[in-house]
Amino acid sequence: MDAFKLLTRSIKLKGSQLGSSSISSHLPSAGEANNPQLFPASEADKTRGTKRKRESGEDTELPNEIPVPDFFGSGSTAAESPKAQRKRVTGKDADAEGQHGEETSMPEEERKSILKSHKIKMTDLRTPPFRAVDTDISGKKSKRKKKKVEEPPPLTRKQLKAAQRLYPEPLTSFDKLRTRYHISRRLSDNIASQGYTVPTEVQLGSLPLLLGNAPAPNERTADDESLRSQSEREPDLLVVAPTGSGKTLSFMIPLINKIMKHHHDNPGLKEILAIVVAPTKELVAQIVNEGRKLTAGTGVKVSAVRKGMRIVEERGQETRSLEEENDGDDSTASSDEEIHSSEGEKSKDIPLTKSDILVCTPLVLANALSDGGKRDVAPLPSVQKLVLDEADVLLDPLFREQTLSIWRACTHPQLRVGLWSATMGSNIEELTKSTIKERQELLGLKDESSLIRLVVGLKDTAIPNISHKLVYAATEQGKLLGLRQLLHPTSTSSSTTHLRPPFLIFTQTIARAIALHSELMYDIPAEAGGSSRIAVLHSELSDSKRSDVMAGFRKGEIWVLITTDLLARGVDFRGINGVVNYDIPNSSASYVHRVGRTGRAGREGGVAVTFYTKEDIPYVKNIANVISASENLRGTEEGERIPKWLLDALPSLSKNDKKDLKKYGVKARRPSTISDKTTSKKTRISTKSGFDRRMDNKRKGAIKGSQRRKAREQLNDEESEDDVWNGIDD
């Protein structure tokens, strides 16, 4: 019985107060989630793998929460180092345990149970070297014909899947990184200082594969090294995990650990050992920022590739093409030599980068390795690890040529590749297999490297911890009205969609993002900050402007950010309360990445609202199917799901239509249709009357005409000055 309810029976509370308190208590901006896992294990699974017998000096119960510092206490107890925390929690020195303690291996049934409860599936994509044998059939035939040896029948599809499944021991706690996998003490402290306590599903499954159960550094011998090189080689990994599940941490920890071991074995040698490729500059800056937090005090340097950075040694003049040497006369040849020599002197003045990990977009690195396309791509023989973040985009036709050129430039025989994304099609898997095989044949490698696929949850599905709303708005004016209702909610009932700032708004094109920003610029009152609370971000802005907008949005100075698919992938905004798809995405994968900007690290309460009009109806079914799959995974009640009649009524797209939609977007909103007056009226983002638009166009035309007249007058003045006779020269 609720005592507060009994005591306030005669008091009429305002509905807005009740609604606001209930809504604000479950928002992503309210703080971090207690458990970052999307598919947490049951209580029975949590106790598995733990010791029943307590060690001497160990407490009966472990604290479930991080200790809160006493700000008013003495100075000696105000702060506590991570090492002291581990001593206080476990009652012994965790570092000593990591060097001398032995971890018992987990039984296979227990490993299977944990991986299944967290919805983790690992598959070896190599063809199994064995075949299934039917003993009854082979026995009968061997009696009749002893001389003839028959081959065993091929594996069935079910047997093949069972043979390819892997069940490695999962990482149940970040403490085991030090005790079992023997990572650096400094790296372990950096992980603890960032507040990482419980590994997410992708970290639980991928870190054991990438780190391996290596012996401790002081116990390693030559025999151990040879055994590890043969039986415990790091695999090529293809990971499909939900958005916001911690993929960056999953590939950065093994990279840093491997580079620190390389520095220990080769002191004084500085070279590029790992490359991380991402599709956007914003994602590159984010990865560098997270990497620098983890590498503090480790001696590992993480840098972003900038224009003009010198990555490889200067190549000789013999790489110039024969056409440049043979074309033209002697004077042109000598001038070309002077130009090349001056360029060579300038490049020699730029110091060679001393970074261990380079993070870049594909075009910047490809241009740096080929001098802007003037030469062949220079090899990178020292790179031992290549990571493709958002690999499905990097291997899409837009970036494929640049990404593959970087991949082929990494000529180290022990190169390992990691492909990470929330969506991964079968075509990307086939391209990965063919590229690895082609590279092995080119380098003459005989041993086939293992390629493992790790899938968390349902493949190509939106995260289940947010609510999805598909809203029919009929026209562009209806979408504007619906968006303003989200900005200024009037109803307090729980049935309506509540969306509190900060949130993102996605549009199809840059022009539409700019138009929507100008339309909503003054919707927030001046008392709350006015137009400074709404901003627009797209690729045509300068780098400094883009970084300023990103910084303002992270600080909370900007509440509503209007953007294109530039921010749809990888960028981590942990406190975003929702996402609005003002224009429907071009594909189901784009929808998964857009709505994944909210609900990061298991945060509940995020909302994804998608508006669609009459022109969008032929393209909505793919998005509706993704929403339906996410609702099934979440266990949404029947009344809150997308109705089945809507899924049945929406038309399906052909393969060619899907390709056109992915490449060009919805036909009615493509830039090529702007010239059509009828279509442009339907898709115009504006509430201005025709008279106001005509007056604006006249004013803009007058300004342009004035600028043209000034330019023409200035040109005439320069010509008249040249025509003036200055007399006879002395």
From Swiss-Prot:
One of its GO terms (biological process) is maturation of SSU-rRNA. The Q motif is unique to and characteristic of the DEAD box family of RNA helicases and controls ATP binding and hydrolysis. Residues 15-112, 130-156, 211-233, 312-348, 661-730 are annotated as: Disordered. Interacts with the U3 snoRNA and is associated with the 90S and 40S pre-ribosomes. It comes from Coccidioides immitis (strain RS) (Valley fever fungus). Residues 700-711 have a biased composition (Basic residues). Its EC number is 3.6.4.13. ATP binds at A241, P242, T243, G244, S245, G246, K247, T248. Residues 716-730 have a biased composition (Acidic residues). A motif (Q motif) lies at residues 172-204. This is ATP-dependent RNA helicase ROK1. It is an enzyme of class 3 (hydrolase). Keywords: ATP-binding, Helicase, Hydrolase, Nucleotide-binding, Nucleus, Ribosome biogenesis, RNA-binding, rRNA processing.
